[in-house]
Each structure stands twice: as structure tokens, then as C-alpha cells.
Amino acid sequence: SNCADHRVPDDETCLKMIIGEVERLPTSAAPYYRRGVDPSPPRFSADETSSLFPIDYRHAYDMRQVLARLVDDGLFREMAPEVGPEMICGVGRVGGLYTGFIGNNPGLTPHPVLRGEQRPGSILYRDGIAKISQFSRCCNDDGIPIVWLHDISGFDIGPEAEKQGLLGYGSSLIYTNSTNTVPMITVLLRKASGAGYYAQAGMPYDPVAQLATTISRLSVMDGRTLAIGAFNTKLDDNFEIVAETDEEREKIRRGMDAVEARITEDMDPVKAARQMDVDEVVRFSEIRSYLETLVEAAYQGCGYRRVKNPRIWSLHDIAVLGEGGS
């Protein structure tokens, strides 16, 4: 019936023939793109990664210390750190292969306009969005896979954001990630909430893999944020409860706590995996090894790849990044 090309006596022989057929395929492109650079372990042990994260997810940590435990030799070329400092982007090697990294920078960062003022990180502001959009396009143009490190609460909101046209910048980022053809890998380090999760190559935008850690909190809206929204008419400008009696105050507090607890329960990473919202739940110490495998797979393309030479991007690209979205 011509449904098979070979007839074999047993499974063992069949497996040997399959191995032989695979050996005849074109070899991996990875050795070529290493360009004589041998894979190296990170400068700091990946086993230390979990110690970088505070127990309370509202407390900050240093994303650059996380990167030092993911890239070869801890070497990372950061692009435009002075522009949109709430976002970190640059290139390092994973297993000897160029890899683009884009991550949120938790903690307070200097306000770009109000001198002496600071604003919270883990939020997408205009300049940061412009920077990572341009960087994402640069990586796509050169065929460099991108790793997104999520610790995102969402987009900036309010009159200032509207005046800056933040919606247009956000649309540009979403369009960029929707049209990229390089493999993108998403790692949910701690929290991934709201439209920021989607814009940073979340699962709906088809990353080749989405990894969650054991403390990841994936949600459309953070529990505390939803509680504030639900009880907004009972709160002042500082989100403190306004009530005439202690009984009323306690009732509002219990209601807010109940909303927050329900959403927090739904944020469980194992539950997200069961719902196929993530591909794998991994320990912090395993992230590096997973990235080695995924990045190697990204360079397994047979034949044509768009990386033309060892350059990372052109001088024009660097000039655009320096403009900071202006």
C-alpha cells in the first residue's frame, strides 16, 4: 500500500533506523553562531537565584543580579540604561549563543521629568516601552532569540500617561511582538498582571515556551488592585478606608481582604499550568538550564538564518535607542 518505506523485524531495529535518518539531516547551526566561543557557565551559581527574591512580592530586588546568574560568565551588554530605567534590555550569551534579554526592573526609579521624584518600577512607562520595542525589533532583524523576564504589574495610567500617548506606544510594542519571527521565550519570575503581561510576549502572543517559577503570580489584575477598584467609592486618594463607624470600616476591610484572597488563590502557578496558561513550572535554579535548551533549539534552523555577521545591531539602531522614544 506504500504506507511505509522500510520493513523492520522489531522496535530496536526501527529505533536504530530512525537514528540513522536523523544523522543524515543537516547539522545544527549552533556551532556556527557561537563563532568559536565555547559555552560558559554563569559567573554566579544558578543555585543562588532563589535567594535574590524577597518573600513579600511587593519588595524589590536587583534584576541585574538575576541576569548575572543566567548569562555566560555574567557578561551582559545593556542597551540605553539611562532611558526608561524601569526596563532592562541587552544581549548576553546563553550556551555560547547570542540571546536578547528584556526584563522589568523592580523598585523605585528616577522620574524623567520631576527632579528629585521617583516612581515605582515593574510598570510600563512611555520611554521604557519605546526602548524595549526598538530593542525587540533589532533582535528580530538580526535573528536573535529574545527572553522576556516578567515582573510586571501593568501599564502606567492616569492623565500624564494619556497626555504622553501611552496607548500608542503600547500598541507599537504589541504590534512588534505580534509580528516578530524570532523565537521568544517568556519567564514569569514573580508577577505578571494585566495588559503588561500580554504586551511582554505573554502566552497569547505565542512564545515558544512560557516558564513559571514556584512563586509566580499570573493574573489579569492583581488581587489588591481589584479590591481597590471594587471598593473605590469607600476609599480616599491614598486608598485608605473612609467610614463613619468602626463596624463599617471593618466590613469594608473584610470585603477587600476576601476579594484579594480569592484572586491570590487563582494566581497559583500550578493551577496556571493545569489550565495550560504556562508550559512548565520550574525552580529558580533550573531557569538557566531550561534557557540553554530553548536557546539551542532556537538556533537549530536548517539553512538560512538572518544573522549575517557577529554584529548585534547597526549604528542606526543604536542611535534610535539613544533617542529614548522621543
Each model region followed by its residue ranges:
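Ligand-binding clefts of soluble mixed alpha/beta catalytic domains
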Residues: 1-326
